[in-house]
């Protein structure tokens, strides 16, 4: 059973969010870095699953997310994929339906990049980005780094799906579960396993947001504390235990960056 909500902030502050043995594999920046020189928008396309036909509510490349969000959710795993041991509860093959909301819901309405922010020349998600880099890049286009609650809701929808695409784990829908992790010539770094943003169209959330359960690890700001005080990463290609919408990778500060780290932006509606 997985229960996610504000209580997890304490765990992050204590540094006990599990991240696996390769947390230090990517290089850590020693201070603020320059914002990326090229940041392309997230794509385009009409929102899928957004409430109503309100396409003018968001900037180009963003999707409208609107509905009733549950801050604290109970999701019960019916069967785990891995044998008993350290990694037994890392990957859930199937969750019970429906999930249970354990707190009052609140109305949310915001915009989010349909795809991760990308390199213009390759279409790959930007990587080696810190939270501070993401903040500068998003603010340069009038947007912001997503809050964790916004990211969660854009991923799971009102049904509180454990995975953006449903209740059963189908990692092949996404650029995920890469296990050959270390770079050949730089074994202290993660291998670059990015896929072009949006190249896995079935890795889509109820709102049509892509790649939330794979590709780069995306920076978000934890709710309930001053912005940038506690930051976590959501979704990635390299940690099988971080495939679900409510999963998060903690233990890094706002200046950390690695082969796996990227971002998408959020914004208020027009």
Language model segments and positions:
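Short, compositionally biased
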Residues: 2-3, 8-17, 22-139, 159, ...
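Functional-site microenvironments in short loops/helix caps that host divalent-cation chemistry
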Residues: 131-249, 254, 259
């Amino acid at each position: 059973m997985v229960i996610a909500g504000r209580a997890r902030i304490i765990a992050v502050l204590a540094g006990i969010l599990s991240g696996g043995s390769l947390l230090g594999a990517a290089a850590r920046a020693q201070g603020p870095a320059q914002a990326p020189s090229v940041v392309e928008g997230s794509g385009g396309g009409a929102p899928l699953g957004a409430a109503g036909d309100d396409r003018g509510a968001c900037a180009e490349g963003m999707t409208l997310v609107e509905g009733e969000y549950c801050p604290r959710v109970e999701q019960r795993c019916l069967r785990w994929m891995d044998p008993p041991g350290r990694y037994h509860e890392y990957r859930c093959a199937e969750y019970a339906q429906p999930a249970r909301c354990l707190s009052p819901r609140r109305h949310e309405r915001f915009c989010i990049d349909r795809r991760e922010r990308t390199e213009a020349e390759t279409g790959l998600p930007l990587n080696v980005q810190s939270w501070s880099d993401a903040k500068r890049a998003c603010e340069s286009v009038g947007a912001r780094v997503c809050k964790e609650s916004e990211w969660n809701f854009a991923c799971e929808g009102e049904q509180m799906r454990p995975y953006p695409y449903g209740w059963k784990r189908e990692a092949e829908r996404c650029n995920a579960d890469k296990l050959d992790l270390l770079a050949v010539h730089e074994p202290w770094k993660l291998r670059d396993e990015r896929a072009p943003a949006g190249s896995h169209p079935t890795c889509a959330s109820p709102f049509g947001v892509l790649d939330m359960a794979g590709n780069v690890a995306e920076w978000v700001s934890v709710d309930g504390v001053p912005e940038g005080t506690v930051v976590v990463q959501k979704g990635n290609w390299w940690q099988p235990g971080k495939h679900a919408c409510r999963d998060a990778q903690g233990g890094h500060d706002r200046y950390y960056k690695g082969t796996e780290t990227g971002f998408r932006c959020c914004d208020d509606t027009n």
